[in-house]
Amino acid sequence: MEKEENILGTEKISKLIKRFSIPCIISLLVNSLYNIVDQIFIGWGVGYLGNGATNVVFPLTMVCLAFALMFGDGASAYLSLKLGEKKKEEASKGVANGILISIIISVLLCVGILIFLPQLLNVFGCTENLEKYAVPYGGIIAIGLPFMMIGTTLNSIIRADGNPKYAMISMVSGAILNTILDPIFIFVFNMGVEGAAIATVISQFVTFLINILYIKRFKSVIIKKETFKLNFNVIKKVSSLGVSSFITQMSIVLVIACENNVLGKYGSDSKYGAEIPITVLGIVMKISQILNSIIIGIAAGAQPIIGYNYGAGKTKRVKETLKYVLLTSLGISTIAFILFQTIPDKLISIFGTGDENYMEFACLGFRIYLMLVICN
């Protein structure tokens, strides 16, 4: 690990960003693909009502992802910071407590969602026509949320341990499996949205298992059974370091909840109806999530670099890293803006087709909603 520490403190910033951010971006994109792939196959196999149903369930996944990223990114930042300060024992406590709190919160969220699923779906704008698809889909997805949360938390920590390729492989394995299982369950077994949910849970479990196996392979710290003791002071520090990721994700959840309800209310009085606007919003959000995954991935990949150099007192390298991240993000957002404004119909059609009203609202919503992506 000493070699890794020297690299973080001496290697060219652009090279380090690419090394740590690319696997991180791929991991986040793969995590997003679970929902995106579901929607693509559901759109062609069930129709836009099926897509609308997954859209009102999606915020529940985002809530869980917010906690997972808070604990994962927080623990990874804590790990890098303590390694920079040469405090390996403290670093191992941060890793262990990040994993422990993720396990506890994931189980609590799973139980809560299963108990209050219909009520939660109503909060996120579920209509009567969407409910018959959303409830069975959401119930199955909820069962797999602990695997998704713990796997995501571990993924962030594994990257900070200097093994971004392993983290990438674990996520890619699950995504490939999900892509294979989705058409089998939806079209071959004719299970509709339930089939898509089952495929997702199985794939998340595989990713979870691969990441769990890494615990004994940590290079920077030694994780023993004794290390797994709840320390609320450490949890507080870990959470504070990852709270920005939490706020980012939860703000998206709040936006989706408000927009679903507003679109459902006013859409029902228009020629589009309630379901078309809700479905379109979800699809637009999924495509937007691809861009967000890239931007967040760049930032998350920079965390170990910033954390180590800040802990080592190398403020010049910290500033250089921030400048590189901001300029890269601006360039990518500009390219995305051009695509979103010029070919919305092509992007929407990936998720299935609909009537004239559906496509009309889809193109309109796409251009308006993603008008300011350049500000990401």
Task: Locate predicted features.
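Short runs within selected transmembrane alpha-helices of multi-pass transporters and secretion channels
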Residues: 72, 141-159, 167-175, 196-211, ...
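Short membrane-interface helical motifs at transmembrane helix boundaries
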Residues: 108-139, 335-363
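Signature of the first transmembrane helix
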Residues: 15-76, 244-265
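Membrane-interface helix-loop junctions in multi-pass transport and translocation proteins
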Residues: 9, 175-208, 274, 345
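Interhelical loop/hinge segments that connect adjacent transmembrane helices in multipass membrane
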Residues: 1-21, 200, 211-252
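Helix-terminus/linker motif at the lipid-water interface of multi-pass membrane proteins
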Residues: 33-51, 121-128, 184-191, 253-283, ...
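Alpha-helical transmembrane segments of multi-pass membrane proteins
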Residues: 128-151, 283, 356-376
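Small-residue-rich hydrophobic transmembrane alpha-helices
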Residues: 51-111, 148-167, 260, 280-344, ...
